[in-house]
Amino acid sequence: MGGVKSKPKELGQRSRSLDDGTGGHHHHTPNPTSFTPNRSPPVEGSRRGTQPNIINAEQALFGGVNSTTNSITSPNRIGILGGVTTFVALYDYESRTASDLSFRKGERLQIVNNTEGDWWLARSLTTGESGYIPSNYVAPSDSIQAEEWYFGKITRRDSERLLLNLENRRGTFLVRESETTKGAYCLSVLDYDNVKGLNVKHYKIRKLDSGGFYITSRTQFSTLQQLVNHYRQHADGLCHSLTDVCPVLKPPTQGLARDAWEIPRDSLRLDVKLGQGCFGEVWMGTWNGTTRVAIKTLKPGTMSPEAFLQEAQVMKKLRHEKLVQLYAVVSEEPIYIVTEYMGQGSLLDFLKGDMGKMLRLPQLVDMASQIASGMAYVERMNYVHRDLRAANILVGDNLVCKVADFGLARLIEDNEYTARQGAKFPIKWTAPEAALYGRFTIKSDVWSFGILLTELTTKGRVPYPGMVNREVLDQVERGYRMPCPAECPDSLHELMLTCWRKEPEERPTFEYLQGFLEDYFTSTEPQYQPGENL
């Protein structure tokens, strides 16, 4: 780890007294490997906290971080009504249409009109040119949101995902809002020692009534900027002095551009065929000659264009960093569905491929927690997926997982599918009340999530091996449940069994599943040791 020294004993004791105000709060990921979720490798552009010219096309253009949930990188919105008219660019942006405005990180912009939601009309104070800009790419000048180290409403778990990257050195840091104390902040710092390896320490930044800030009351600062600068110069009780700002990729824009929803077919180019299913194909493509996207083409007759367009209006409002973002549609047959592009394809193919062989339980559980996070949002929005399985989860670089194809299953008009029997219907993933009586709810999605956990722990094996669909339905009705997969801890199999309870209301919520999986290696399996496969 590049000259890491053991910290002195007294420093360790002082650190424990400072951390989170309660003592030594840190999170350790067992057996850290190169699989550090939520980071993607370089492609183009720039990322906050590093030198320019490093960005991932998938995340930059289609990363799914949103304004309706905790966002990794979006600044808090501040309107121009209060006299704040000058904003600063947080990232580079290349225009995608004639009405867009290109700008560079650090450029100052005057907001002309911010009443149109996700895209604001702005004028560059550098070039004098005007055009539309993505509102989540700018922050008010001289505000905390404009600081490279300020990550806003990022969760504790996401801060750890970002910091626990093997490219980061000891002392890499970020500042975020406290999840537990309103108005307070948290300083998250990457640490390393020979016993725990890489781990993240979290220090609560408390606010004085007079407006100042402190981690320990003997050292107080009038601004957060002064606090950060102080701990850059001296560890002063922290696990390490602050070194680098945590790198983060550009967030996605909300939509492809202003007013780009129902788009002409000729604005899309199908570049590389990625897959084919019962109802259509999936392509990597390009929109408007500028923007990489994924395009799902549906066979004519698969669903009613009118019903699809109505459902798509709901689907496009679902915005969460763990849901694949719906960007645009071609609403005449053959229907095209345009979404963000995920570079590693479906989770099922990923698990069965070369990368799958290298995955161990910490990475698999982290992927499961990301899926549960996306589904917890679906749960909060009172929506239902209806077809949750590894084939409908997409993987980005560095094990970012996102839920795809939510809500589409309801619209399929194929007789063999709607009868819930035959090869086209995913019986093995479907809860009995949904398969037998068509009762699809978020609780039938929870059942499917339990099946998905078996796909993860068996690296993509088909559920109920050796059994045909009809047999599965009969056996499950009689109380049969799949046994614990090889090397899978009993505690994880017990979680699967709770997802497969006969009575839907007795199954856990996705909110519970997310919390259980995020804390799995601290609360449930702290003694985990890697095995041959898991």
UniProtKB/Swiss-Prot annotation:
EC numbers: 2.7.10.2
Region spans: Disordered: 1-50
Gene3D superfamilies the UniProt entry points to: Phosphorylase Kinase, domain 1 (3.30.200.20), SH2 domain (3.30.505.10), SH3 Domains (2.30.30.40), Transferase(Phosphotransferase) domain 1 (1.10.510.10)
Activity regulation statement: Becomes activated when its major tyrosine phosphorylation site is not phosphorylated. It can also be activated by point mutations as well as by truncations at the C-terminal end or by other mutations. Heme regulates its activity by enhancing the phosphorylation on Tyr-528.
InterPro entries listed in its UniProt record: Kinase-like_dom_sf (IPR011009), Non-receptor_tyrosine_kinases (IPR050198), Prot_kinase_dom (IPR000719), Protein_kinase_ATP_BS (IPR017441), Ser-Thr/Tyr_kinase_cat_dom (IPR001245), SH2 (IPR000980), SH2_dom_sf (IPR036860), SH3-like_dom_sf (IPR036028)
Catalytic activity: L-tyrosyl-[protein] + ATP = O-phospho-L-tyrosyl-[protein] + ADP + H(+)
Lineage top rank: taxon: Eukaryota
UniProt entry keywords in alphabetical sequence: ATP-binding, Cell adhesion, Cell cycle, Cell junction, Cell membrane, Cytoplasm, Cytoskeleton, Kinase, Lipoprotein, Membrane, Mitochondrion, Mitochondrion inner membrane, Myristate, Nucleotide-binding, Nucleus, Phosphoprotein, S-nitrosylation, SH2 domain, SH3 domain, Transferase, Tyrosine-protein kinase
Tissue expression per record: Widely expressed.
Protein family per UniProt: Belongs to the protein kinase superfamily. Tyr protein kinase family. SRC subfamily.
Quaternary assembly: Interacts with amotl2; this interaction promotes the translocation of phosphorylated src to peripheral cell-matrix adhesion sites.
Protein known as: Proto-oncogene tyrosine-protein kinase Src
UniProt source species: Danio rerio
Underlying gene: src
